[in-house]
Structure formats: structure tokens, C-alpha cells
From Swiss-Prot:
Cell compartments where the protein resides: Cytoplasm; Mitochondrion intermembrane space
Residues given in the record as [4Fe-4S] cluster binding sites: C311, C314, C322, C325
Region: N-terminal SAM-like domain, residue numbers: 1-158
Oligomer status and interactors: Monomer. Interacts with TAH18. Interacts with MIA40.
Organism: Saccharomyces cerevisiae (strain ATCC 204508 / S288c)
GO cellular component labels: cytoplasm; cytosol; cytosolic [4Fe-4S] assembly targeting complex; mitochondrial intermembrane space
Gene: DRE2
Polar residues: bias regions: 144-163
The name this protein goes by in its record: Fe-S cluster assembly protein DRE2
Region (Fe-S binding site A): 252-268
Post-translational modification remark: Ubiquitinated.
Lineage of source species: Eukaryota, Fungi, Dikarya, Ascomycota, Saccharomycotina
Length: 348
């Protein structure tokens, strides 16, 4: 048996950037007679790429840069590390955050001198313990005065003198027999009851009322002569006002304009009146501006004596010229100044 304990070093991936931390941990373990025979990254063990042998190590050390209160460790690996440890082996590097998982997997938590988890021996946990059974106490118990305690016997059916009770018979009810002399009284009606037909009478009365009302209406219309009082439709029309328009338009008192426009399905003549007004306005506008054929032809500056027109801004430069101006691209000039190639030779 070697002098050093076999150990396993599990490293957090962030520790790979500080190799001096790993060397210091190995040096401290060597001072405690612990030799790390294996060294793995925790993520390799978590994804299953590395498997551990059962009961191989005496010490497992988890090295992480995280604080004790912020350690994040896969809970499923606690049972794997418990299987890889020998009985009474220690697990170093985890905190009380996983205290419940440690107790479930058979670890005992040690706080002094250094915090660690110790794997308990399963053989001791399963060891049977004999429990002595209690013996029956005899009745030889004595009081302080030396006298024995009184004994009591269970009463039996032969020795018990309890009173017995019997169920009383039900009392018979008296039977009444009929005798020949007893006869039940009989009742007879002196006269037959009268039956009144109320419903039929009411129905007959209502029928009589309806018939009487119908007959009275018929007599009224027979007496009234409608031939003399009939009025023809044409008589209702006044001869003087037959040609006048019965529809009056409401106009505003200030602007003297109509307040209401014609409806979509106008039948009163308002729509035609509005169309006539619009046509009159358009005809007046056409009379204001009217061009001749010469004025409507395209302006050509190459023809001598041809009247030309423009906006009057041709001499100011391109920024003030129209899109069809023939002077586009030429410099500004004075109105009436003749333009030739010599005057613009510097700009060409």
C-alpha cells in the first residue's frame, strides 16, 4: 500500500486560463499526502465522454474560480462521484448549496477542520442491531412499606353476579268486535242540487253583443249617402297656382346662397339648376383666355420676325429659366444684348 492517497482533480473550464492555480492546488494536496492520479475537465465528465471507475479514489477535489455561494455544479454528477470514491473517501470543493443532494447520496458533511463531504461506509449503514425485548414483570412488586400490591382478577361468567334483564312482552291492543245492534249512520239528500251553466250564458251574451254592434254599423253606412260628397282630384288643384313651382328654396340672408345641395336622386329640378350655373361659369372662363393658332404654335427663335414669348427671366441665368428655355446652359446676360459664340467662349 502506497503512502499517498489516490486523488481525482476535476477542473472548471475557466481555470484553464490560470495554470498557476492548478499547480498550487497540487502542491497543497501533496503536503497532505494526496496524489492526483487523474485530472479531467468537469464538462467532459458531464457530457459522458469520460467515465469514472467505481471505488477508485480516496479524494476528489473540484477546482473552480467561483465563490462558495455562487457555485454551479451538475447535480447528477454527485452520485457519480459518490460511486467513484472508496468508503470514508472525501469530496472537496462543493458548498452547502448541494447539502440535500449530498445527504441523499450517502455523504456526511464535515465542517471542521476543513469543510468537506465524507462518504459513509455502506457496510456499517446496513449492519443489523439487535434490540432486547422487554420481559414481563412479575407481580412481586413491593411498596416501600414492604407490602405487596393488591392483585385483581378478571371477572368470568360464572363468578359475575350482574343482574339479568328480560325483554317484556308487548301489550296486546284491545280488539273491538262489531255487534248486530250497532249500525253506522246514513245520510240522504233532501233535494237535488241545481246546476247553473254560467259559461254558456256568457258566451251567448258576447255573441249577441257582437251581432248588435255589426248591425248598428251596417245601419249607419246605409243611412250615409256618399255619392253627393265625393271630391275629384282635379278639383283640389288651384287654376291660378297650377303653373307655379310648389317647392321653395331656402337661401341664406347674408350671402344669398343656397344652403342645401341637390340630392343624388334629385327630382325637384335643383340638380339641373346647379349644372346650368356651372356651365355658365365655365363659358365665362373660356372667354377670358383664348389663344389663336399662331399663339398656340411652338416658339421657334430661329425664325426672324417671329413673335417670341417668355417668362422674362431668361437673362437671369439657369436658376430662373423654364424647363424649355432655349438659353439653358448659357450664362446670364443683359436684356437686348446680342449673344454670339465669342461672348461665351470663356464658358465653353
Amino acid at each position: 500500500m502506497s503512502q499517498y492517497k489516490t486523488g481525482l482533480l476535476l477542473i472548471h473550464p475557466a481555470v484553464t486560463t490560470t495554470p498557476e492555480l492548478v499547480e498550487n492546488t497540487k502542491a497543497q494536496a501533496a503536503s497532505k499526502k494526496v496524489k492526483f492520479v487523474d485530472q479531467f475537465l468537469i464538462n467532459k465528465l458531464n457530457d459522458g465522454s469520460i467515465t469514472l471507475e467505481n471505488a477508485k479514489y480516496e479524494t476528489v477535489h473540484y477546482l473552480t474560480p467561483e465563490a462558495q455561494t455562487d457555485i454551479k455544479f451538475p447535480k447528477k454528477l454527485i452520485s457519480v462521484l459518490a460511486d467513484s470514491l472508496k468508503p470514508n473517501g472525501s469530496l472537496i470543493g462543493l458548498s452547502d448549496i448541494y447539502k440535500v443532494d449530498a445527504l441523499i447520496n450517502g455523504f456526511e458533511i464535515i465542517n471542521e477542520p476543513d469543510y468537506c463531504w465524507i462518504k459513509m461506509d455502506s457496510s456499517k449503514l446496513n449492519q443489523t442491531v439487535s434490540i432486547p425485548l422487554k420481559k414481563k414483570k412479575t407481580n412481586n412488586t413491593k411498596l416501600q412499606s414492604g407490602s405487596k400490591l393488591p392483585t385483581f382478577k378478571k371477572a368470568s361468567s360464572s363468578t359475575s353476579n350482574l343482574p339479568s334483564f328480560k325483554k317484556a312482552d308487548h301489550s296486546r291492543q284491545p280488539i273491538v268486535k262489531e255487534t248486530d245492534s250497532f249500525k253506522p249512520p246514513s245520510f240522504k239528500m233532501t233535494t237535488e242540487p241545481k246546476v247553473y251553466r254560467v259559461v254558456d250564458d256568457l258566451i251567448e251574451d258576447s255573441d249577441d253583443d257582437d251581432f248588435s254592434s255589426d248591425s248598428s254599423k251596417a245601419q249607419y253606412f246605409d243611412q250615409v249617402d256618399t255619392s253627393d260628397d265625393s271630391i275629384e282630384e282635379e278639383e283640389l288643384i288651384d287654376e291660378d297656382g297650377s303653373g307655379k313651382s310648389m317647392i321653395t328654396m331656402i337661401t341664406c340672408g347674408k350671402s344669398k346662397t343656397k344652403k342645401k345641395k341637390a340630392c343624388k336622386d334629385c327630382t325637384c329640378g335643383m340638380k339641373e339648376q346647379e349644372e346650368n350655373e356651372i356651365n355658365d361659369i365655365r363659358s365665362q372662363q373660356d372667354k377670358v383666355v383664348k389663344f389663336t393658332e399662331d399663339e398656340l404654335t411652338e416658339i421657334d427663335f430661329t425664325i426672324d420676325g417671329k413673335k417670341v414669348g417668355g417668362c422674362g427671366s431668361c437673362s437671369l441665368g439657369d436658376a430662373f429659366r423654364c424647363s424649355g428655355c432655349p438659353y439653358l446652359g448659357l450664362p446670364a446676360f443683359k436684356p437686348g444684348q446680342p449673344i454670339n459664340l465669342d461672348s461665351i467662349s470663356d464658358d465653353l
